[in-house]
């Protein structure tokens, strides 16, 4: 396995990679990590210009609510990048019910605190992004916490199916079974360092990665 470090991209791109008021990275940072992954995997990354930039407006994240000096923090702005092509997405809940949902949700008129829900509609046990223009393309699975939400849509340009699993919520099968059942070619882990260090998180990952 090969780790992909967002710091490798930050040496080249001097734009905002993390929100000021939130613990998440921006969609731009996720794109740069996607580019780094493609280089390692021997794939051609899609150009950012191929995506449609969407402005979801001002955003106040988790740091804002937890900071005693929150009034001094400047608002962030959430930008999202809609992938081109015939892209569909299905959300599967923990009770097995499934429904279609847009890859990017228009949260421009929603609460200033909810804008990160733009990406994949938030956190769900299983999300399947399908590029119907690549019927013979490979399949990948992204094991993630919420950091994976803005990252996964970019992969739709290189894979037929992108399966996105939130290991904190998914318990239908272990990774080894999932890889066999869905004919997975590549496995990616996208997670924040803070979550990776939590004991409960490691227990969940240990179970899922059997």
Where are these regions (language model features)?
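Single conserved hydrophobic/aromatic residue that forms the stacking wall/gate
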Residues: 1-9, 13
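Alpha-helix N-cap/helix-initiation motif
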Residues: 2, 22-23
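Alpha-helical hydrophobic/aromatic positions enriched in membrane-embedded helices and signal peptides
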Residues: 3, 18, 136-137
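Lumenal/extracellular "mature" regions of secretory-pathway glycan-modifying transferases
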Residues: 10-22
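Extracellular/periplasmic envelope-modification machinery, especially enzymes
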Residues: 23-139, 144-177, 181-185, 189-210
């Amino acid at each position: 396995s090969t780790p992909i470090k967002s710091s490798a991209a930050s040496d080249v791109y001097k734009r905002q990679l993390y929100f000021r008021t939130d613990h998440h990275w921006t969609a731009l940072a996720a794109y740069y990590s996607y580019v780094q992954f493609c280089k390692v995997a021997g794939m051609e990354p899609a150009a950012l210009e191929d995506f449609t930039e969407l402005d979801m407006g001002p955003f106040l994240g988790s740091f804002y609510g937890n900071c005693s000096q929150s009034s001094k923090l400047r608002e962030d702005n959430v930008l999202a990048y809609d992938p081109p092509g015939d892209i569909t997405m299905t959300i599967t809940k923990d009770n097995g019910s499934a429904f279609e949902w847009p890859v990017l949700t228009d949260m421009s008129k929603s609460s200033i605190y909810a804008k990160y829900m733009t990406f994949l509609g938030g956190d769900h046990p299983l999300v399947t992004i399908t590029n119907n223009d690549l019927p013979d393309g490979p399949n990948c699975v992204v094991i993630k916490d919420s950091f994976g939400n803005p990252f996964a849509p970019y992969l739709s340009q290189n894979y037929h199916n992108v399966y996105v699993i939130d290991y904190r919520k998914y318990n239908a099968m272990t990774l080894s079974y999932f890889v066999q059942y869905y004919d997975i070619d590549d496995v990616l882990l996208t997670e924040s360092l803070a979550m990776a260090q939590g004991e409960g998180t490691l227990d969940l990952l240990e179970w899922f990665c059997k």
